[in-house]
Amino acid sequence: MSTVTITDLARENVRNLTPYQSARRLGGNGDVWLNANEYPTAVEFQLTQQTLNRYPECQPKVVIENYAQYAGVKPEQVLVSRGADEGIELLIRAFCEQGKDAILYCPPTYGMYSVSAETIGVECRTVPTLDNWQLDLQGISDKLDGVKVVYVCSPNNPTGQLINPQDFRTLLELTRGKAIVVADEAYIEFCPQASLAGWLAEYPHLAILRTLSKAFALAGLRCGFTLANEEVINLLMKVIAPYPLSTPVADIAAQALSPQGIVAMRERVAQIITEREYLIAALKEIPCVEQVFDSETNYILARFKASSAVFKSLWDQGIILRDQNKQPSLSGCLRITVGTREESQCVIDALRAEQV
């Protein structure tokens, strides 16, 4: 008689799943953490809600209204969730039939699109970006049959560049009546002029992902948003958990989205952009750096000579970067979060000391 293990009882797609390798899961013992695109210092908040004996609202009214005002959309076009990652998953759960439909994304890009789909049992299709990391629209068009959700990250993680807005329009026309197009704008606060939020009236099948983890300096809060037309939001509300945001999370999110909170966020963005330009200029002068790519975000992608050795050398010194070497078209590339001036200097000094 054969023995059935617990693993044997699991779904086949889960047994075969490679989980997303988050910065924390990868570990490391560092003093300089530049691998997760977090804001380098903590922002202080005081809790004002003490009703922890009661369940929270599913969609806290103040949070929704504050975010709608900030994003320039209607409150009924906003859904709040446990980070933008939950929004990625909700869109698949609401629109994709297991074993029938597919999602499509364009590597190199954020890894949670594929993990979310594979966990649910939905097919993943990929159309790698062109050499300039813009969309291969012909390639996408050729693979759209059966695709229900298309994910496009702009600015793209990990490459840092914006997707051409005309290409977005072409994609939205290609998919009209066929699929939802999801613009992942996790880093849009660093280039707000490029947001597609103003396009919702034109495109009923457009959804936009946002987060408080980056420019709002609240990665530990786990609070994200989906912006979409009311019909899409209503469908997502059918599949979201009954209490996605705890009372303390909603409390802090509402404060972060107050007029004072928005001003503070924009000051942080200006500071990070100044620091980013300083770090880019310094990296371009370092012998072990082959190429530094332009960035519209709070991180920089660079190609290195002997990138694996450089990554390990800095890791051993307690400077933790993100290795992108295995991503399509990113051979030799490391991603560096823009931190404080002191952290930038640690990276610069360590890289200058590398023997090429």
Swiss-Prot record:
The record's annotation in PROSITE patterns points to:
AA_TRANSFER_CLASS_2
- Disulfide bridge positions per record: none
BP GO terms, sorted: L-histidine biosynthetic process
**Which EC class is the enzyme in?**
transferase
SUPFAM superfamilies of this UniProt entry? PLP-dependent transferases
Pfam family name, one: Aminotran_1_2
Q: Look up the record and name the cofactor or cofactors this protein needs.
A: pyridoxal 5'-phosphate
Q: Enumerate the InterPro entries for this protein.
A: Aminotrans_II_pyridoxalP_BS, Aminotransferase_I/II_large, HisP_aminotrans, PyrdxlP-dep_Trfase, PyrdxlP-dep_Trfase_major, PyrdxlP-dep_Trfase_small
The UniProt catalytic activity note for this protein reads:
L-histidinol phosphate + 2-oxoglutarate = 3-(imidazol-4-yl)-2-oxopropyl phosphate + L-glutamate
EC number(s)? Answer: 2.6.1.9
List where this protein forms a coiled coil.
Answer: none
Keywords attached to this entry: Amino-acid biosynthesis, Aminotransferase, Histidine biosynthesis, Pyridoxal phosphate, Transferase
This protein's record includes keyword Transferase: yes
The molecular function terms in GO held by this entry are: histidinol-phosphate transaminase activity; pyridoxal phosphate binding
- Pathway in which this enzyme or protein is active: Amino-acid biosynthesis; L-histidine biosynthesis; L-histidine from 5-phospho-alpha-D-ribose 1-diphosphate: step 7/9
At what positions is N6-(pyridoxal phosphate)lysine found?
Answer: K214
- What HAMAP family is this protein classified in? HisC_aminotrans_2
Q: Which family does it belong to?
A: Belongs to the class-II pyridoxal-phosphate-dependent aminotransferase family. Histidinol-phosphate aminotransferase subfamily.
Which proteins does it associate with, and in what oligomeric form?
A: Homodimer.
- The protein in question is named Histidinol-phosphate aminotransferase
Task: Give the source lineage, highest ranks first.
Answer: Bacteria, Pseudomonadati, Pseudomonadota, Gammaproteobacteria, Enterobacterales
Task: Identify the gene encoding this protein.
Answer: hisC
